[in-house]
């Protein structure tokens, strides 16, 4: 990588570590087929990514947001929590209607399994096929 390119990027992204993260993420996107916003000039993907950041054809904030989303494994959806007052009112209405609430067991019971049944179940398991991942 050209030192000039990195020094041009420091003006846009002050932290060198963050610059490396953003440029490497952008280089991976380019290698996966994302369109580039500048002329390639026979440069490799990391250099193209740095030149895009230096020329401000991509916003560092947008790259950072995209990097964060790519690293998230579980995206939490904000759902409104039920209002406790409405739940109490709904429970009170159901009890007032005379519905029997005997359907709900008071204690939770689990299936009991003997040691022999457990061992037979374990012996019946099929081991997964080996892959080249590890």
From Swiss-Prot:
Gene3D superfamilies: 3.90.940.10. Transmembrane segments: none annotated. InterPro entries: DNA-dir_RNA_pol_omega, Pol_omega/Rpo6/RPB6, RPB6/omega-like_sf. One of its GO terms (cellular component) is DNA-directed RNA polymerase complex. SUPFAM superfamilies: RPB6/omega subunit-like. It catalyses: RNA(n) + a ribonucleoside 5'-triphosphate = RNA(n+1) + diphosphate. Belongs to the RNA polymerase subunit omega family. The RNAP catalytic core consists of 2 alpha, 1 beta, 1 beta' and 1 omega subunit. When a sigma factor is associated with the core the holoenzyme is formed, which can initiate transcription. NCBIfam families: rpoZ. This is DNA-directed RNA polymerase subunit omega. It comes from Rhizobium johnstonii (strain DSM 114642 / LMG 32736 / 3841) (Rhizobium leguminosarum bv. viciae). The gene is rpoZ.
